[in-house]
Amino acid sequence: MIIKPRVRGFICVTTHPAGCEANVRQQIGYVKAKGPIADGPKRVLVIGASTGYGLAARITAAFGCGAGTLGVFFERPGSESKPGSPGWYNTAAFHRAAAQEGLYAKSINGDGFSDDVKQKTIDAIREDLGQVDLVVYSLAAPRRIHPKTGEVFNSTLKPIGKAVSLRGLDTDNEVVKDTVLEPATQKEIDDTVAVMGGEDWQMWIDALQAAGVLADGAKTTAFTYLGERITHDIYWNGSIGAAKKDLDQKVLGIRAGLAAKGGDARVSVLKAVVTQASSAIPVMPLYLSLLFKVMKAEGTHEGCIEQVHGLFADSLCGSAPHLDEEGRLRADYKELSPQVQARVTALWPQVTSQNVRELTDLAGYKAEFLRLFGFGIEGVDYEADVNPDVGIPNLVQA
């Protein structure tokens, strides 16, 4: 079939298999051009491995460090008549590229919050790798079924303590408008922490340790975003921020548990990028459109693969990691540089529906959004007939 983009709000409901493959190949090309990463991990588990930062971590581990990788995700395959999800095609492309280089790659498709997927992951590590020396936690999901109680939690994007009026951008209609968000209830805050906080990361590491599949000296990191003042009401000071603070608490226990065998656990802070998750957050499309404009002018603009490659080379595997006073690894320092934030803050109140194209890089934001779904990528023939039914070799279906 011939597949065209169909965007509804913050989701594109179609995906292009060849475009996703080209996008993955470009990221692999970037990592390979940078050369091997010294002292990199060789057996890597990525939880949330199919899109965005998790995919970038898998690509960096494999093609920058020469690592065998095991990826966990929850994606939808395509059929002859309907495209699958982007992460499905990204993973199929990754597997093909890894096989060409003789790199081990296996994936598990299922609910990463579940005990079943954790057990299948442990079984795969035991059978194929023995142990892993790096665990990347990059799971982004709106809901979680608790594996012990069966309780269902839904995350909420709300401020805490007071209603907040936020400037936002309707990217479909290119209209700048204010949105009032009512404060989260305590249950909504608790549920968001249950979905997006550190409990599941802790459960993963506990399960891997108990099974003996973590190597001595193993490291783990969970990816997060903190942002600056403009996004703080909805982010750091909101319901999501409560989950981020929980991550900062949970990492202390995980770190102590791994330190006994020479290991380490860190939260890694990455810059704001266009992802399916961030596009759903009020404020973020406008903030990102401004950030793109300012950082491109400065020559410091980066996407997922540049960020994660830098994190691996400088901090996860480097001898002088970028640490903040909380002990987090920081890769977001270019975004948070005073001159970038001052420029974004100055432009923020000036943007209107009339000048949004001129003051921001809305075109760049929209192009980046479509790239997530395999569209607008140079070298891809979008008039060609493609088969959306693409298989993933070496896939365990949970």
From Swiss-Prot:
Enzyme class: oxidoreductase
UniProt keyword Disulfide bond, yes or no: no
Pathway entry: Lipid metabolism; fatty acid biosynthesis
One GO MF term attached to the UniProt entry: NAD binding
Superkingdom, taxonomy of origin: Bacteria
Keyword Oxidoreductase: yes
UniProt site positions, description: Plays an important role in discriminating NADH against NADPH: E75
Keywords in alphabetical order: Fatty acid biosynthesis, Fatty acid metabolism, Lipid biosynthesis, Lipid metabolism, NAD, Oxidoreductase
Catalytic activity reported: a 2,3-saturated acyl-[ACP] + NAD(+) = a (2E)-enoyl-[ACP] + NADH + H(+)
HAMAP family to which the protein is assigned, alphabetical: FabV_reductase
Name this protein carries in UniProt: Enoyl-[acyl-carrier-protein] reductase [NADH]
Gene: fabV
